[in-house]
C-alpha cells in the first residue's frame, strides 16, 4: 500500500458506453491493493465519455477525482459532503481519458449487449500529478491500437501501458525539473492567440476567486484553457491537492514567514515570493470537466467559488444563476455576467498595453502547422517566453502590493519611510494594476495566505513595478497640460508687462534681432542712402496694413492704424484719380514736408525688360499705398496690386461718393510725381522716396522697398508741381485710357471728374 501511495500512476481503467445502462467502468488495472473498485468514483464514466464526444474521432478529457487515502475509496456523497474526520484523509487525483469509436460490424467478436451500429470506449489514466501532456501521446497510440485489434476482449495492451507509465514516472523522476514537466502539452500560445487580452482578465478573475464556467464543444480545448491559465501562476500545478473539494484547505496558523531564500534554488525563491498563490483552498472547487451528475457539488453552499468546464448545453443555459463569468471556447469570448465585476476586472492602461504586446508577438509568429512552436523556432513568442512574462508580471504585482501596504502601515513613521528609496516612495506602482482589482484581491483567501507567509519588505529584493515599461498616456497628457499652462502663463505675463510699458528680456532681444536684420537689409538694398534713422514704427504700421483682411460687407479694406485714418480725404481722392492716368498729384501746402509711398505691383508684365525706376512708380502708383480711410477706400487698387486695375468692386481709380465730389473740385492744385500719404507717424520720420533705378532691385516690388528701407525725405523737391514724362508706349497709354473708361462706366458718379482728367492729360 505504501508503494502505491508513493507511485505517481495511480491506476488505469477502461470505460464503455453501454447501450442500455449508459457509461460504466468495464475494467480496472493497477489499483492499490485493498481498494474497493466498486465504490470508486461513480461519476468517472461520465467524465471519461463527455457529452458530444461521439462527434469526434478522438477526444481527450482532463478531470479531477477525490480520493480517501485511509479508507481507499472515493467520498460516498460527493466532493461537498465530507465528514469532519475524513477531510484530512482526502486528496485530489488527476485523470486523462482518450475516447474513440468503431463500427460494430468491424468487431471480430461482438458482445450480445452491442445493439447499436457503433461502439464507444475510453481508456483512462489516473495519476497523482497533472502530467497530462507527458502521457497524452502514449495514451493516444495505445487507444488507437486497442481499437485496431477489433477485439475488446484482449486488454494486454492496456496493462502494458500501465507498466510502462509506472516505470517512467516515479516520485524521484518528477522531482527533477518537476515544474517544467507539468507544462508539457499546455499550449499558452493557443490561449493568447484566441483570447488575447481576455487571457489576463481570466487570470485576474481566478485570483479573485470567482465562479467561472468554461463551455465548448471541444472538450480538450476547454480543459487545456483551464490548466493553461492555472499554470501561469508559478508552481501552482504542483500544488492542487486541495482543489478537488471546497472542504479541503491548509491550516494557515501553522505557516511560518519565509524570510530567506537561496538564489540558486528556484523553489526557494518562489517560496520567498509567496508562490504558489493558494487559489483553490477552502470554499474553492476545480473541476476541468464537470458532467451534469456533479451539479450538486456546484450548487452546494460550501462551494463559494469554482472553475469548471462543460460541454453540456443545459449547463450553459443556466449560466446566469450559476456563475459570475462565462467563457465560450467555441468563439473565444468572455462574458462577465456579474456587472459589479466590470470596474474590478477592467484592465489598466499598462495591463492592456502589456498583454496586447504579448498577444501581438504570438500573432506575428503564429505557425499554422504547429500551435506550440513559433515561426523559425525563435524564443520570442514561445511557451517559455510567455510563461516568464507572466511570472515577471505577477512578481511585480506582489512586490507592489507589499510596498503599498507597508507605506499605509508606516505612513506616520518617518524613520521607517526613510529606509525606502525616494524613487520607490514617489512611484508606488500599485495603481498600475487597477486599484479596484487590488482592493478586491486583498479580500480573498489566497491573499491572506500569501500575506501571512511572506516578508513585509519583499520589495527590498524584488522591485515593485509593472512589467510594461512604456510611457503612460495619462502621464504624457498631464505633462503636456502643464507645459501648455506654463506657456499661457508666460504669455499672459508678457502681455501685461507690455501694457504697462515694460518689455521682457526675451522681447527686447527679439526686437534687437529684428532691428539688426532690418539694418542689414537696408544697407544691402540702398547702399548709397543714409540708413541711420530707424523706421521700426513705420514698418509695424505698414505690416499691420498689409496683413489686414478684406471687409466684403463694407466693400473696403479695414485699416487698424490711426496714422492711416487721419489722412486728408480730398488729397487722396485726387491722388487716386491722377494715378489712374499715370500722373501724380502734390498739394501746395505740403511741398516742404512730404512722404512718398509707392504701392506694390504684383502684375507687372514688363518685369523682363530693364525699366527705370520711373516706370516702376507708374506701375505701382495706384496700389495699396493709395488707400483711403474707412469711408474713402473705394479708390484703392485690389489686394493683389494689379497695375491700374481695380478689384471686383470697381475700386480702380475711383473714389467713393464724397471722394468724387472732392475730385472735381481740387484739380487746380496741380500735379506731382509722387503719391502723398500724410500720417502723424510719417511727419516724425519724414523721408523722401524718389526714384533712382540703381537704388532698387528689379526683382522686388516698390512696396517691399518701402517696408525695408522706409521713406526718405526729398531734399531736391523745390518746384510746386512736377510732371513725370510718360515713357510708356502708345499701347500702355491706350491701356490707361481704357482702364479709366472702364472705371467711369462702373462708378457712374465720377464721369465728369475723370473726363476732365483725360482732357488735361491730352493738353499736356
UniProtKB/Swiss-Prot annotation:
Protein's name according to its UniProt entry: Late secretory pathway protein AVL9
Family label: Belongs to the AVL9 family.
Residue(s) carrying Phosphoserine: 519, 524
PROSITE patterns found in the cross-reference section: DENN
Main localization, broad class: cytoplasm
Function noted in UniProt: Functions in the late secretory pathway. Required for the generation of secretory vesicles as well as for actin polarization and polarized growth.
GO cellular component: cellular bud neck; cellular bud tip; cytoplasm
Biased composition (Basic and acidic residues): 502-518, 715-735
Amino acid at each position: 500500500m505504501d508503494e502505491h501511495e508513493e507511485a505517481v500512476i495511480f491506476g488505469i481503467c477502461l470505460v464503455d458506453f453501454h447501450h442500455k445502462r449508459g457509461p460504466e467502468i468495464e475494467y480496472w488495472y493497477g489499483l492499490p491493493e485493498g481498494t474497493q473498485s466498486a465504490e470508486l468514483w461513480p461519476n468517472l464514466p461520465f467524465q471519461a465519455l463527455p457529452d458530444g464526444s461521439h462527434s469526434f474521432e478522438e477526444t481527450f478529457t482532463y478531470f479531477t477525482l477525490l480520493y480517501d487515502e485511509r479508507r481507499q475509496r472515493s467520498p460516498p456523497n460527493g466532493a461537498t459532503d465530507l465528514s469532519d474526520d475524513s477531510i484530512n484523509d482526502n486528496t485530489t487525483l488527476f485523470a486523462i481519458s482518450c475516447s474513440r469509436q468503431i463500427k460494430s460490424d468491424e468487431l471480430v467478436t461482438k458482445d450480445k449487449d452491442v445493439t447499436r451500429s457503433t461502439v464507444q470506449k475510453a481508456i483512462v489514466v489516473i495519476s497523482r500529478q497533472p502530467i497530462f501532456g507527458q502521457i497524452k501521446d502514449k495514451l493516444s497510440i495505445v487507444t488507437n491500437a486497442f481499437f485496431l485489434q477489433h477485439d475488446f476482449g484482449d486488454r494486454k495492451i492496456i496493462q502494458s501501458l500501465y507498466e510502462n507509465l509506472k516505470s517512467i514516472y516515479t516520485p524521484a523522476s518528477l522531482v527533477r525539473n518537476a515544474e517544467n514537466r507539468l507544462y508539457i502539452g499546455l499550449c499558452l500560445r493557443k490561449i493568447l492567440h484566441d483570447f488575447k487580452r481576455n487571457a489576463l482578465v481570466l487570470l485576474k478573475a481566478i485570483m479573485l476567486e470567482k465562479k467561472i464556467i468554461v463551455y465548448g464543444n471541444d472538450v480538450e480545448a476547454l480543459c487545456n484553457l483551464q490548466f493553461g491559465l492555472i499554470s501561469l501562476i508559478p508552481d501552482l500545478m504542483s500544488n492542487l491537492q486541495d482543489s478537488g473539494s471546497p472542504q479541503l484547505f491548509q491550516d494557515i496558523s501553522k505557516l511560518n514567514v519565509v524570510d530567506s531564500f537561496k538564489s540558486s534554488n528556484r523553489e526557494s525563491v518562489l517560496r520567498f515570493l509567496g508562490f504558489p498563490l493558494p487559489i483553490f483552498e477552502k470554499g474553492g472547487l476545480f473541476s476541468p470537466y464537470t458532467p451534469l451528475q456533479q451539479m450538486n457539488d456546484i450548487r452546494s453552499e460550501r462551494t463559494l467559488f469554482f472553475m469548471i468546464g462543460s460541454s453540456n448545453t443545459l449547463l450553459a443555459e443556466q449560466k446566469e444563476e450559476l456563475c459570475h463569468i462565462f467563457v465560450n471556447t467555441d468563439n473565444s469570448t468572455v462574458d462577465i455576467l456579474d456587472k459589479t465585476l466590470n470596474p474590478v476586472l477592467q484592465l489598466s492602461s499598462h495591463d492592456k498595453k502589456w498583454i496586447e504586446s504579448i498577444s501581438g508577438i504570438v500573432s506575428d509568429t503564429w505557425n499554422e502547422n504547429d500551435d506550440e512552436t513559433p515561426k523559425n523556432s525563435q524564443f520570442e513568442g514561445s511557451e517559455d517566453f510567455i510563461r516568464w512574462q507572466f511570472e515577471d508580471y505577477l512578481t511585480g504585482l506582489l512586490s507592489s502590493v507589499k510596498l503599498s501596504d507597508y507605506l499605509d502601515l508606516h505612513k506616520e513613521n518617518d524613520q521607517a519611510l526613510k529606509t525606502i528609496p525616494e524613487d520607490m516612495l514617489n512611484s508606488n506602482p500599485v495603481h498600475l494594476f487597477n486599484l479596484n482589482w487590488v482592493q478586491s484581491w486583498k479580500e480573498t483567501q489566497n491573499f491572506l495566505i500569501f500575506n501571512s507567509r511572506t516578508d513585509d519588505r519583499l520589495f527590498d529584493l524584488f522591485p515593485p513595478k509593472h512589467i510594461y515599461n512604456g510611457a503612460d498616456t495619462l502621464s504624457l497628457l498631464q505633462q503636456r497640460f502643464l507645459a501648455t499652462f506654463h506657456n499661457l502663463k508666460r504669455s499672459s505675463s508678457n502681455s501685461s508687462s507690455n501694457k504697462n510699458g515694460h518689455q521682457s528680456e526675451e522681447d527686447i532681444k527679439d526686437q534687437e534681432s529684428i532691428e539688426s536684420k532690418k539694418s542689414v537689409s537696408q544697407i544691402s538694398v540702398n547702399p548709397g542712402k543714409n540708413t541711420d534713422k530707424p523706421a521700426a514704427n513705420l514698418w509695424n504700421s505698414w505690416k499691420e496694413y498689409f496683413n489686414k483682411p478684406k471687409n466684403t460687407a463694407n466693400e473696403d479694406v479695414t485699416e487698424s492704424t490711426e496714422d492711416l485714418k487721419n489722412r486728408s480725404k480730398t488729397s487722396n481722392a485726387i491722388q487716386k484719380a491722377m494715378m489712374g492716368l499715370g500722373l501724380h498729384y502734390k498739394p501746395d501746402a505740403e511741398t516742404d514736408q512730404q512722404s512718398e509711398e509707392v504701392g506694390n505691383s504684383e502684375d507687372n508684365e514688363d518685369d523682363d525688360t530693364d525699366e527705370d525706376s520711373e516706370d516702376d512708380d507708374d506701375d505701382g502708383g495706384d496700389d495699396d499705398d493709395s488707400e483711403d480711410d474707412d469711408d474713402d477706400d473705394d479708390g484703392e487698387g485690389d489686394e493683389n496690386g494689379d497695375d491700374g486695375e481695380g478689384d471686383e468692386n470697381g475700386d480702380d481709380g475711383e473714389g467713393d461718393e464724397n471722394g468724387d465730389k472732392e475730385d472735381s473740385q481740387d484739380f487746380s492744385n496741380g500735379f506731382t510725381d509722387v503719391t502723398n500719404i500724410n500720417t502723424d507717424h510719417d511727419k516724425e520720420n519724414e523721408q523722401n522716396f524718389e526714384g533712382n533705378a540703381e537704388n532698387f532691385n528689379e526683382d522686388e516690388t516698390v512696396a517691399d522697398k518701402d517696408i525695408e528701407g522706409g521713406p526718405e525725405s526729398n531734399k531736391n523737391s523745390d518746384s510746386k508741381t512736377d510732371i513725370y514724362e510718360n515713357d510708356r508706349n502708345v499701347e500702355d497709354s491706350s491701356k490707361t485710357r481704357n482702364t479709366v473708361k472702364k472705371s467711369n462706366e462702373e462708378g457712374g458718379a465720377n464721369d465728369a471728374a475723370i473726363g476732365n482728367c483725360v482732357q488735361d492729360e491730352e493738353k499736356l
